[in-house]
Amino acid sequence: MATEIFSDVVKSVWSHATAKHAHLRMAVQVDNRSRLLSDLVYQLEKRLSEETHLDDETYALYESQTGLLEDHMALVRKCAAQLDNSNTIDHRTPLDPECVFLFEMICPGVRYGKTLNSLWSKYAAQWPEKLIRQELDMVKPLSFKDEVAKYMEKMQEKTRKNRMTQKVINEMRIAHQKGWFFVFDTLTLADDRLQAFNENPNALRDYFRTVGRAVLRAEGRSVKDSYNDCYRYLCVPEFGGQHGRLHWHVVHMVRTLPLGSHDPNFGRPVRNYRQINSFRGMWPYGFTQPIAVRYQHDAYSRKGWLWPVDKSGKAMQSKPYQAVAWYVTKYVAKQSDQRQKAITERQKKCKNPLMAICLKKEFRVRSSRKLGMELPSMAHLSNKVLLELSRISFDSSPLYQIVKENAKKQLTLNIGALPLHVILDVRPEVRSMLKAIRRLMKKTPEFNWQSSIASMTVTLKNGDISDEARQYIIDAGITPTDLRAKATQTFGGK
């Protein structure tokens, strides 16, 4: 690998690599903790030297704080001494008796694994920087949220929303190609079941387990099996506009419909039913309305289900699955916008005290594990092509964030066999984007948010990437043309 490309690869996947590879993560955290403790020792000595009157109580406190820092420094130094820079970054270091002794003294009663890496992870979790500062009475003051910080929060929220949107589209694309069934459901909370819902923190988890096990039974499998290969879901919370009442919109993607599922329009003179009764009764806290999602060439048509009509008797408009996917994502965008609203505003609209208790909780978008992250393997691609894919923009694919994450994961695996010292030699400097933007605002009279942030990140247009990278996107079927909702026609129904 060329030196320039190698350096760019490490910079591109640094956060992924430190999260994935235990040896590298520990080396970085040990170095950061050593710097922190040295700085705290300096501040403690400086504070002591500035004391005009040193009584016994103050001196005893200083001795206690100094002893705490010395214990932590001893563990950090011992762990640093055990790190082998010539070993690979995915190496697992065996336990050292002295490290175990120091750990048990600092973290009494805390369990740890069989490697030094797991012991260090437990220590870092038990003693974060904030807790150490609290013990030393050196808590950092909360920073004031200026215009830059508020804008960055909005940008992060927008990025999360776009990422979830792309994951939903990709998951529905994959499910459509596999011939799965889509069911759209709305979960509500009945007044007489609010207390039971409030008392069960795992109500939603239990509901999705019930649906997953129903799919397993329909396939003749044990309910103890994992249903991740035959059932996927997305659940988006929403608060009603008039009374702020909590409910959820759910998209079920199933390989096999639960037992008892049949065409609701079979034998009916007017085919205007779409509810699937086999999904009802699984949510014990209110009402549900499970509806078959019909679109061009869907699994229901291949199963022989009749095409539904509207109230006037006309065949319902048939759209491609892409249009259905984009429709579902609007709920994700709406939930993201509602998160910005204050909880007190919702409670003012709510008359029921039990519902007001629900509104105090923060409900997030729930989904199956690794929803929408599946793409064709990138193991055959070169590091240069992977680096290009890790920098693509919307021009190349509407699923650009999914492609970038998969490319970075593959790059992270590719560098896993390299020695630790080789990676640390090209360790990128971690810069604060907040500080960088603030400096730009001072230097630039006519400051532009988008152009400034774009200048700090490397992105490639479709014309900037190689033919091999472009061919991967085409073969994966995730080009803008592939994911564009085309002209609506009536297809696939009887």
Curated annotation (Swiss-Prot):
| Pfam families named among the record's database cross-references | Phage_GPA
Instruction: Give the organism, scientific name.
Output: Enterobacteria phage phiK (Bacteriophage phi-K)
Keywords for this protein: DNA replication, DNA-binding, Endonuclease, Hydrolase, Metal-binding, Nuclease, Viral DNA replication, Zinc, Zinc-finger
**Highest taxon, organism lineage:** Viruses
Q: Its encoding gene is what?
A: A
Miscellaneous note, as given in the UniProt record, is: Phi KhT, a host-range mutant of phi K, can grow on E.coli C and B, besides K12, and is more thermosensitive than the parental phage phi K.
Question: Which GO biological process entries does UniProt record here?
Answer: DNA replication; viral DNA genome replication
Indicate the residues that form the catalytic site.
327, 331
Give start-end of the signal peptide. none
Query: Zinc fingers (unnamed) at which residues?
Result: 230-252
* Molecular function per GO: DNA binding; endonuclease activity; zinc ion binding
Write down what this protein is called.
Answer: A protein
According to its UniProt entry, the function of this protein is described as:
The A protein is a specific endonuclease that cleaves the viral strand of supertwisted, closed circular DNA at a unique site in the A gene. The A protein also causes relaxation of supertwisted DNA and forms a complex with viral DNA that has a discontinuity in gene A of the viral strand.
